């Protein structure tokens, strides 16, 4: 968080494993750890402060948050890039989204958005389906770009967008459709173009399929559920790619 918007008076920075202090007793608690550490963070947070947790991770957190009675917790979709510690972040502004792509929802969304704006960064305060749609687009972005990049030797995001655009488009299209059906939303036309534009902003990013449970695993679970019900795999390209990379041992079968 400090790398994104800097520190302000009253901020307390905690390292991994450090307990959440009694003071300050109010205000947002920004959680910028790895997804696999989230359960420990929640368990270690005083119950009366859990509603103040602000989750800033990639991936679909919905089921996890619901399990922890935090379905209404503040969440953030970060479209930012920090090349290295101490450098100013690159904002997620593209030619198609001049107002930026970063978004937040929940109790502390407006506070977070104001903080970013004070640091010269953009942030949208969204709610309901508007946030769900933005969340799906971000999830498709990371899952599709990372998969296509890994399938082509771990190339950069920029190389994926420039040299493998048609392969990327096909994966994005099927993941968007599967996600829309699962979440009951409809993305605005031009999703691929928006995601490709952001890829050009962070062209230097490396690619790899990581944190499977939180990222590509969400789409693979949709595949498994469909096949179990005797339906066609809604994400065949995604499934084939995961199999080729050895992320899943075998393609699912009815």
Each predicted region: which residue ranges?
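Electropositive phosphate-/nucleotide-binding environments in soluble metabolic enzymes
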Residues: 75-79, 106, 110, 169, ...
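A short alpha-helix-loop-beta-strand transition element characteristic
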Residues: 51, 124-125, 233-234
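Long, hydrophilic "mature protein body" segments
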Residues: 3, 7, 25, 35-36, ...
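Rossmann-like NAD(P)(H) cofactor-binding subdomain of soluble oxidoreductases
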Residues: 1-94
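Internal alpha-helical scaffold of NAD(P)-dependent oxidoreductase catalytic cores
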Residues: 48, 84-185
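Hydrophobic, Leu/Ile/Phe/Ala-enriched alpha-helical segments that form helix-helix packing faces
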Residues: 4-8, 33, 41-45, 112-120, ...
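NAD(P)-dependent Rossmann-like dehydrogenase/reductase catalytic/cofactor-binding core
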Residues: 114, 169-254
């Amino acid at each position: 968080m400090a790398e994104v918007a800097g520190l302000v008076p009253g901020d307390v920075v905690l390292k991994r494993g450090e307990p959440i202090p009694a003071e300050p007793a109010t205000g947002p608690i920004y959680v910028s750890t790895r997804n696999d550490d989230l359960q420990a963070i929640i368990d270690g947070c005083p119950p009366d402060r859990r509603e103040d947790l602000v989750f800033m991770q990639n991936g679909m957190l919905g089921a996890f948050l619901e399990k922890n009675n935090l379905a209404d917790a503040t969440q953030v979709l970060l479209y930012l890039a920090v090349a290295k510690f101490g450098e100013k972040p690159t904002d997620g502004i593209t030619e198609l989204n001049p107002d930026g792509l970063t978004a937040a929802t929940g109790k502390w969304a407006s506070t977070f958005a104001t903080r970013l704006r004070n640091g010269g960064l953009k942030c949208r305060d969204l709610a309901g389906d508007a946030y769900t749609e933005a969340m799906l687009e971000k999830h498709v972005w990371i899952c599709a770009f990372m998969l296509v990049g890994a399938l082509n030797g771990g190339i950069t995001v920029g190389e994926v967008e420039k040299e493998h655009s048609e392969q990327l488009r096909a994966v994005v299209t099927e993941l968007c459709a599967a996600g829309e059906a699962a979440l009951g939303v409809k993305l605005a036309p031009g999703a691929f173009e928006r995601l490709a534009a952001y890829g050009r902003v962070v062209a230097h990013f490396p690619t790899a399929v990581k944190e499977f449970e939180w990222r590509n695993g969400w789409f693979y679970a949709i595949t498994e559920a469909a096949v179990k019900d005797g339906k066609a795999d809604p994400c065949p390209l995604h499934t084939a790619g995961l199999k080729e990379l050895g992320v899943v041992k075998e393609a699912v079968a009815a």
